[in-house]
């Protein structure tokens, strides 16, 4: 079995075409440009004076001897037709009168009526069978001297043909047997002299043959047939039956008539006798004109048609309009009369029309679609045998002539059908369709058997035309001054024109040729042109050599870019090696010049942009200056140049990209130095420090915009695609180490410049913030904190609004971050130095709250996660405590102990079990102390003497309620108290934050102070019945683990202890210190 490697596969059509073109181009590249193909000789549509006179005579003769009524849309007046002929033939009035008189003196033609009896329907059935054997008698009666409407005339209208017309002038059709709808389709030529007194007569008869009665009885079908037998028995043997007649005055007929006429009776016996289909045409015999005597009728008609169409086309062109068909009623009338009088068949009329139009199309400008109708007519009626040898030759010549002319137009379609004219595509498409229809005709195939297939002829014409057009363009772009630079510019213009032509071929022309002829014009043109372009580009780059000047380098770069675009235009499905494959190697020596010029041009633009920059924002929404915009454009141009270059060789492409990145980063740092120097230069002449700050803001914004531009280099230079290309030729990570290292170094330098600028702006505000915070603290005590903070907030509002207006969002956010960090530092220092002043702490607390709102700015400033730093949270907590009163601090202390109680699960110190409920009706807090368990042995005997002290805390909320105690249990670590206590207390203080029942378990000591077993805190807000109006039921038991105070002290206690002048605070701290001391003496070994 043969495999796909056994034999080479057949090449696709596109590949075969490319191979053929390449072979031809090898010869073409070595030979001089081919000579232009000789132009097709077009026959003139003008007649000689003698031919024109004969044709004019023929036209006048046709009008003067017109017969019949005019057609509905035809011209009635002969004078109007004569005037039109005089204009169409451009005959002077005197000459016209002379020729008209001469034509009138010519012998009249023999007038004839061409009558065709087509068929009849619904005639009477005269035979016994119910049918008839009809035939017709017809002729023309000349009425001489009989006035219209006289009795004789009326009688003659009732007369039959055999009684009124001589037998030699009578014509008879064939007999159609046994039918009521006979079909004859027979034509007769009937001559007459005077149309005004002539009438056409047609009688229809039923042929009667002698038959026996027995035979007729055999055909009998009904009573009507029986009556027919009796009637025939009375008449003469062999007498025919009259079926009806048609009588028409010739002067009432049109030049051509085709209709159904009713059969009239001689008597009123049977008024409805059916209809007869007749066709009439008035024709001439023996016309006296020279043209009619010497030339075939269709030739004369063809020449007349050519003359009239030529006149109409010329008239339309003079009026600036396009001719589409014969629209003048005079021309239509004359041509109709001539074809009718000459008795031209439809086929010969179509042939004459084709000969005239195909010849005129080659010399006059009118739509080729006019040729489709005669082509269709000839194809529909084509029968080769009907044409004589000279007619076949004439038709074949017209085919070959139009084909040659059409191919010459197709070869030059770029100039003949320019796209600057809107209807050019439709005109070309119409021409192609005409050629296709013509070559598909049976007549063309029989008369032009040796003609090559039309697609082959058109393809060759397009190929030759493409080559001719290229050489024409090359001559057009030939420089006046010879030199390398001028030659490069000329070659660049040539390549751009070639690409423009290919774009037009692909966008417009290719669809037309492909739809009509299945020809891929674009591919053929591309394959032809790329060989021609490649030769000239290779010769030019060889002439340039290795020493490339800047101007020549720029010209070569533009040529390189154009060639890249040219190659991208090529068909994507072509696998053929093209002449332009690897063309980049021809430009390899120009790469250093291109890179150096790119950097030099960019550096000049950067320097010029900075020098022209006044460091003023471009607008309210645009906060950078002109140099930033110019720099962005400059870097975009560098990226565009890199994309245009797109060097195919991977390793060289990597080195080129490294150079582009290096130059871009260098330009960025150069810009930073230049823009800072420009700011110092402008600030030196400014006396207002605010203007210097404005310039600094603009500089920072410009550098930030530059940083964003540099950050997009990987995308703009397509690093990912480059990394895929160079993966096979570079070491792993080499691209990352080289390009990304360059980029990160540049970004780091720009980031440092931005931070330096923002830090400078922040330093100008930090002094003001510290000053206003100090004034806030030093304000009089009578000033509320909300009022004391106003100067600071107004200062920040003004300054931050200014910075927000002049800085881009990224830099403004950086500034806010620096200011927020500095502000927190100032507040922490102030809070630490005024720790003992609740007033100062209150003001600092209000300041922190307002500053948080200010720096957040409803989402337009710093986000919450940036504001709520560890320093902020610690400061917020400290100020919350420092600003609180002593009683508020005591409440916070008990709230923290309640929280500690809720989080404690270990019972290392023991636990107490209680029940608590509140009776709102009695305003009593009912407490049942049930038991304690697992107490620590604090006595030397290994046991304890426990009792529990019950107090409602904080004391300032329950000043009238004295502490309660349980009984003391001797030597018991698990005492059962089972004691009940009631506290008369309103519900309101019990519901406050920090309100609790403090259960202090003590070990009774007879000799000294009681020892602390532990504390338990029952929050009153959890007591059943306190929040509802319904009396509580059975209160649930609550088991509370015992806890110790914090061994390292409590910040709240330390804060209270610092308030020396507050006796309540000092008493509370003293008690809590005592409890902490007791706890430290008996803490378990595992307690930290």
Swiss-Prot record:
PANTHER family: PROTEIN UNC-13 HOMOLOG D (PTHR45999:SF3), UNC-13-4A, ISOFORM B (PTHR45999). Its main location: cytoplasm. Ca(2+) 2 binds at residues 939, 945, 1003, 1005. Plays a role in cytotoxic granule exocytosis in lymphocytes. Required for both granule maturation and granule docking and priming at the immunologic synapse. Regulates assembly of recycling and late endosomal structures, leading to the formation of an endosomal exocytic compartment that fuses with perforin-containing granules at the immunologic synapse and licences them for exocytosis. Regulates Ca(2+)-dependent secretory lysosome exocytosis in mast cells. The gene is Unc13d. Coiled coil: none annotated. Its cofactor is Ca(2+). GO terms for biological process: defense response to virus; dense core granule priming; establishment of localization in cell; germinal center formation; granuloma formation; natural killer cell degranulation; phagocytosis; positive regulation of exocytosis. The modification Phosphoserine is found at residue 150. Residues 557-675 form the MHD1 domain. Ca(2+) 3 binds at residues 938-939, 1003, 1005, 1011. The MHD1 and MHD2 domains mediate localization on recycling endosomes and lysosome. It is a peripheral membrane protein. GO terms for cellular component: exocytic vesicle; late endosome; lysosome; membrane; recycling endosome; Weibel-Palade body. Belongs to the unc-13 family. GO terms for molecular function: metal ion binding; small GTPase binding. Residues 92-239, 908-1033 form the C2 domain. Transmembrane segments: none annotated. Expressed in lung bronchial epithelium goblet/mucous cells. Also expressed in spleen and testis. Expressed at very low levels in heart muscle, kidney, liver, brain and skeletal muscle. InterPro entries: C2_dom, C2_domain_sf, MUN_dom, Munc13_1, Munc13_dom-2, UNC-13_domain. This is Protein unc-13 homolog D. It comes from the Eukaryota. Interacts with RAB27A and DOC2A. Interacts with RhoG; the interaction increases RhoG affinity to the membrane lipids, targets Unc13d to membrane lipids and facilitates cytotoxic granule (CG) docking to the plasma membrane.
């Amino acid at each position: 079995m043969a495999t796909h490697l056994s034999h080479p596969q057949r090449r696709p059509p596109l590949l075969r075409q490319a191979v053929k073109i390449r072979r031809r181009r090898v010869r073409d590249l070595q030979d001089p440009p081919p000579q232009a193909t000789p132009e097709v000789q077009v026959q003139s549509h003008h007649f000689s004076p003698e031919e024109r006179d004969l044709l004019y005579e023929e036209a006048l003769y046709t009008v003067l001897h017109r017969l019949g009524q005019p057609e509905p849309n035809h011209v009635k007046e002969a004078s109007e037709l004569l005037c039109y002929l005089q204009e169409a033939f451009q005959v002077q009035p005197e000459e016209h009168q002379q020729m008209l008189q001469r034509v009138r003196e010519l012998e009249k033609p023999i007038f004839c009526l061409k009558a065709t009896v087509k068929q009849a329907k619904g005639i009477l059935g005269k035979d016994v069978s119910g049918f008839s054997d009809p035939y017709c008698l017809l002729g023309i009666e000349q009425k001489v001297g009989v006035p219209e409407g006289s009795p004789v005339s009326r009688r003659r209208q009732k007369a039959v043909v055999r009684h009124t017309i001589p037998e030699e002038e009578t014509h008879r059709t064939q007999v159609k047997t046994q039918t009521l709808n006979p079909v004859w389709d027979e034509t007769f030529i009937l001559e007459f002299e005077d149309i005004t007194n002539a009438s056409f007569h047609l009688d229809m008869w039923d042929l009667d043959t002698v038959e026996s009665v027995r035979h007729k009885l055999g055909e009998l079908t009904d009573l009507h047939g029986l009556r027919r037998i009796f009637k025939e028995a009375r008449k003469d043997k062999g007498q025919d039956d009259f079926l009806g007649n048609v009588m028409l005055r010739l002067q009432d007929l049109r030049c051509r008539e085709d209709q159904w006429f009713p059969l009239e009776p001689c008597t009123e016996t049977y008024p409805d006798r059916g209809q007869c289909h007749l066709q009439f045409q008035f024709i001439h015999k023996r016309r006296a004109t020279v043209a009619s005597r010497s030339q075939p009728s269709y030739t004369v008609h063809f020449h007349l048609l050519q003359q009239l169409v030529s006149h109409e086309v010329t008239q339309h062109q003079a009026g600036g309009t396009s001719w589409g068909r014969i629209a003048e009623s005079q021309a239509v009338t004359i041509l109709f009369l001539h074809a009718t009088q000459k008795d031209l068949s439809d086929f010969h009329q179509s042939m004459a029309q084709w000969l005239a139009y195909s010849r005129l199309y080659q010399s006059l400008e009118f739509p080729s679609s006019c040729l489709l109708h005669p082509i269709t007519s000839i194809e529909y009626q084509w029968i080769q045998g009907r044409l004589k040898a000279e007619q076949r030759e004439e038709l074949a010549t017209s085919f070959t002539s139009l084909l040659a002319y059409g191919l010459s137009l197709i070869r030059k379609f770029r100039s003949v059908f320019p796209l600057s004219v809107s209807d050019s595509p439709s005109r070309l498409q119409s021409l192609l369709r005409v050629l296709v229809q013509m070559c598909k005709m049976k007549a063309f195939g029989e008369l032009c058997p040796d003609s090559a297939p039309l697609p082959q002829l058109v393809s060759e014409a397009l190929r030759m035309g493409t080559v001719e057009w290229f050489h024409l363009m090359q001559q057009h772009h030939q420089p006046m001054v010879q030199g390398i630079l001028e030659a490069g510019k000329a070659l660049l213009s040539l390549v751009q024109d070639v690409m423009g032509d290919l774009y037009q071929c692909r966008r417009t022309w290719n669809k037309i040729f492909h739809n009509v002829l299945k020809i891929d014009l674009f591919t053929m043109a591309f394959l032809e042109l790329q060989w021609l372009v490649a030769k000239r580009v290779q010769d030019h780059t060889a002439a340039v050599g290795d020493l490339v000047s800047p101007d020549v380098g720029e010209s070569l770069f533009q040529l390189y870019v154009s060639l890249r675009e040219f190659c991208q235009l090529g068909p994507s499905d072509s696998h053929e090696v093209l002449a332009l494959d690897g063309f980049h190697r021809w430009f390899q020596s120009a790469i250093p010049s291109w890179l150096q010029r790119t950097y030099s041009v960019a550096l000049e633009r950067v320097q010029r942009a900075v020098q022209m920059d006044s460091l003023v924002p471009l607008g309210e929404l645009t906060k950078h200056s002109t140099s930033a915009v110019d720099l962005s454009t400059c870097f975009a141009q560098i990226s565009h140049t890199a994309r245009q270059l797109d060097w195919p060789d991977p390793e060289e492409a990597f080195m080129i990209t490294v150079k582009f990145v290096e130059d871009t980063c260098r330009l960025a740092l150069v810009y930073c130095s230049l823009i800072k120097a420009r700011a110092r230069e402008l600030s030196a002449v400014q006396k207002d420090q605010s203007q210097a700050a404005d310039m600094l803001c603009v500089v920072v914004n410009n550098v930030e915009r530059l940083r964003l531009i540099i950050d997009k280099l990987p995308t703009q230079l397509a690093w990912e695609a480059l990394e895929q290309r160079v993966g096979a030729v570079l070491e792993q990570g080499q691209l990352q180490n080289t390009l990304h290292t360059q980029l990160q170094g540049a970004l780091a330098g720009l980031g440092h410049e931005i931070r330096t600028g923002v830090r400078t702006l922040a330093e100008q505000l930090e002094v003001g913030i510290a000053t206003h915070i100090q004034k806030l603290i030093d304000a009089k005590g009578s000033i509320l904190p909300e009022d004391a903070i106003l100067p600071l907030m107004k200062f920040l509002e003004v300054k931050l609004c200014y910075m927000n207006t002049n800085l881009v969002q990224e830099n403004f956010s950086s500034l806010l971050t620096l200011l927020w960090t500095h502000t927190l530092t100032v507040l922490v220092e102030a809070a630490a130095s005024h720790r003992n002043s609740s007033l100062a702490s209150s003001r600092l607390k209000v300041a922190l709250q307002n500053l948080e709102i200010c720096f957040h700015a409803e989402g337009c400033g710093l986000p919450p996660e940036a504001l709520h730093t560890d320093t902020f949270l610690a400061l917020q907590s400290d100020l919350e405590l420092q600003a609180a009163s002593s009683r508020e601090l005591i409440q916070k202390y008990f709230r923290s102990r309640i929280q500690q109680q809720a989080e404690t699960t270990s019972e290392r110190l023991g636990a107490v079990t209680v029940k608590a409920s509140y009776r709102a009706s009695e305003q009593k807090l009912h407490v049942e102390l049930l038991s304690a368990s697992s107490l620590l042995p604090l006595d030397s005997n290994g046991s304890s003497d426990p009792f529990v002290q019950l107090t409602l805390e904080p004391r300032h909320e329950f000043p009238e309620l004295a502490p309660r105690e349980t009984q003391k249990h001797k030597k018991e670590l698990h005492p059962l108290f089972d004691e009940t206590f009631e506290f008369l207390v309103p519900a309101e203080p019990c519901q406050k934050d920090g309100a609790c029942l403090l259960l202090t378990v003590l070990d009774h000591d007879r000799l000294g102070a009681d020892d602390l077993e532990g504390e338990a805190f029952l929050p009153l807000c959890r007591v059943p019945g306190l929040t509802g109006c319904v009396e509580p039921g059975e209160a649930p038991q609550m088991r509370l683990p015992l806890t110790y105070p914090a061994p390292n002290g409590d910040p709240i206690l330390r804060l209270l202890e610092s308030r020396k002048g507050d006796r309540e605070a000092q008493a509370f701290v003293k008690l809590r210190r005592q409890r902490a001391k007791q706890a430290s003496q008996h803490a378990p070994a595992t307690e930290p």
